[in-house]
Regions:
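C-terminal substrate-binding subdomain of Rossmann-fold SDR/epimerase-dehydratase oxidoreductases
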Residues: 1-93
Length: 93
């Protein structure tokens, strides 16, 4: 719910809930954990939750407006790498 609310905050306007309460759920609980990546690979987040949602919403909004997916991916990847370099992450050296 927090993710959906954050996304809608980045893309205001009319929305329509098309979920089917009778449809099977993907899983009872989805739990993502980056602990192993952090311990083994030294992974650290580059963007905050808010920045990630903002960038994702912009990608979909711009795609909806007709921009090419490859162009959008290149733009966002460049922004991500720039932020990672600014944070001094080892994989950017």
């Amino acid at each position: 719910v927090a993710l959906v609310d954050a996304f809608l905050g980045e893309w205001p306007g009319a929305q329509e809930d098309r979920t089917d309460p009778a449809a099977p759920h993907e899983a009872g609980l989805l739990h993502l954990d980056v602990t192993k990546a952090a311990q083994v690979l030294g992974w650290k987040p580059v963007w905050t939750f808010a920045q990630t949602v903002r960038t994702t919403a912009a990608w979909y909004r711009d795609r909806h407006a007709g921009m090419a997916p490859g162009e959008l991916c290149d733009r966002d990847l460049a922004a991500y790498v720039t932020a990672a370099r600014a944070a001094g992450l080892a994989w950017t050296r």
